[in-house]
């Protein structure tokens, strides 16, 4: 093949690439949604560094203006999972609990502490997370403050899961392609689809997920997205202004049960718990939050802090089939916390992750 022919093919390929992006942007501006396949193809281009900043800015804003639907979110998430560093394990029925963040509540690290307690309760927890974006302390910040190695290789992470029932996958390490979008995301200074993709792109593809969202309108599309991605059991929650199961008011829930989706409301009484104010769960920096987590794991936690962990782990036990109901799960977690056994799990995680 001549050099001129190769150059012509490259030009043709570039023109086709630009045309498909332009078509997608015009489609979105016309208020027409992208298909799962279109979205996945576009995000493959982003993850592989093949989209210019101007094209990416236009695409993200056009998506945001129209409003992302589940097929668009699922296509983007599938692309990110496919382009991620692989994580393999012999364990099955993996679970994760996390939130989108962005609710402005700055609580203690509830889902991260809950993940350690859930591991102590016999659930295979693969926590996928990052450093703080919208709060005082992200999951990675807390785990590092507790002495856990947050930058394990995939082999080390798999070993940690198999030895302790818990592991951590540090998002920047597993999703190198996201760096291609960082400049645009920083410059735009507004929420985009990337703000909701974090909880959906765990490289372990967990079968069970407890996912908190900052806006109740995201509950249903996120459940539909997880169904498309193959998740078996999930609860998408928004608790009275927070991306958590609330203790200070009602929680909107959309539950995914092997393809079936149902919607309902939960209150603390559904866990046999009293109500607590959001102020009672206020967190600070990583070291303060780590001390709070240590107290909880040692069985010396504040009542409100314990309650926040109980509702999350109870939901995970229910979703994993290890509790008959949320109340049954809550009683199991209360007993576990009182025993201080969860501290043994943390110590094992610290030892194995640094080994």
Curated annotation (Swiss-Prot):
Residue sites binding anthranilate 2 per the record: 185
GO cellular component, one term: cytosol
InterPro entries in the cross-refs: Anthranilate_Pribosyl_Tfrase, Glycosyl_Trfase_fam3, Glycosyl_Trfase_fam3_N_dom, Glycosyl_Trfase_fam3_N_dom_sf, Nuc_phospho_transferase
Catalysed reaction, written as an equation: N-(5-phospho-beta-D-ribosyl)anthranilate + diphosphate = 5-phospho-alpha-D-ribose 1-diphosphate + anthranilate
GO molecular function: anthranilate phosphoribosyltransferase activity; magnesium ion binding
Summary of the function given for this chain in its UniProt record: Catalyzes the transfer of the phosphoribosyl group of 5-phosphorylribose-1-pyrophosphate (PRPP) to anthranilate to yield N-(5'-phosphoribosyl)-anthranilate (PRA).
Name assigned to this protein: Anthranilate phosphoribosyltransferase
Biological source species: Pseudoalteromonas translucida (strain TAC 125)
Lineage: Bacteria, Pseudomonadati, Pseudomonadota, Gammaproteobacteria, Alteromonadales
Gene from which this protein is expressed: trpD
């Amino acid at each position: 093949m001549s050099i001129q022919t190769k150059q012509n093919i490259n030009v043709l390929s570039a023109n086709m690439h630009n045309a498909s992006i332009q078509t997608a942007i015009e489609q979105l501006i016309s208020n027409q949604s992208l298909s799962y396949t279109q979205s996945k193809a576009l995000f493959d281009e982003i993850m592989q560094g093949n989209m210019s900043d101007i094209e990416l800015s236009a695409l993200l804003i056009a998506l945001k203006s129209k409003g992302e639907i589940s097929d668009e979110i699922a296509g983007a998430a599938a692309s990110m999972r496919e382009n991620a560093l692989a994580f393999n394990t012999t364990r099955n029925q993996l679970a994760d609990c996390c939130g989108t963040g962005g609710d402005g509540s700055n609580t203690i690290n509830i889902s991260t502490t809950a993940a350690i307690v859930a591991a102590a309760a016999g659930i295979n927890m693969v926590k996928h997370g990052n450093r703080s974006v919208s709060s005082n302390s992200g999951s990675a910040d807390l785990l590092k403050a507790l002495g856990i190695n947050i930058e394990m290789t995939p082999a080390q992470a798999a070993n940690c899961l198999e030895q302790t029932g818990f592991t951590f996958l540090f998002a920047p390490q597993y999703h190198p392609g996201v760096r291609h979008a960082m400049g645009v995301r920083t410059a735009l200074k507004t929420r985009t689809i990337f703000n909701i993709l974090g909880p959906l792109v765990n490289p372990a593809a967990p079968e069970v997920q407890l996912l908190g969202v900052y806006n109740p309108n995201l509950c249903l599309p996120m459940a539909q997205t997880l169904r498309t991605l193959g998740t078996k059991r999930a609860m998408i929650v928004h608790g009275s202004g927070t991306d958590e199961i609330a203790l200070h008011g009602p929680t909107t829930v959309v539950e995914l049960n092997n393809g079936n989706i149902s919607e309902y409301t939960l209150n603390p009484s559904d866990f046999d718990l009293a109500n607590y104010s959001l102020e009672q769960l206020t967190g600070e920096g990583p070291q303060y939050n780590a001390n709070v987590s240590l107290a909880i794991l040692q069985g010396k936690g504040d009542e409100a802090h314990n309650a926040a962990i109980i509702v999350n782990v109870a939901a995970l036990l229910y979703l994993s089939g290890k509790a008959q109901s949320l109340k049954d799960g809550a009683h199991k977690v209360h007993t576990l916390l009182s025993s201080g056994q969860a501290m043994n799990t943390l110590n094992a995680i610290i030892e194995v992750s640094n080994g």
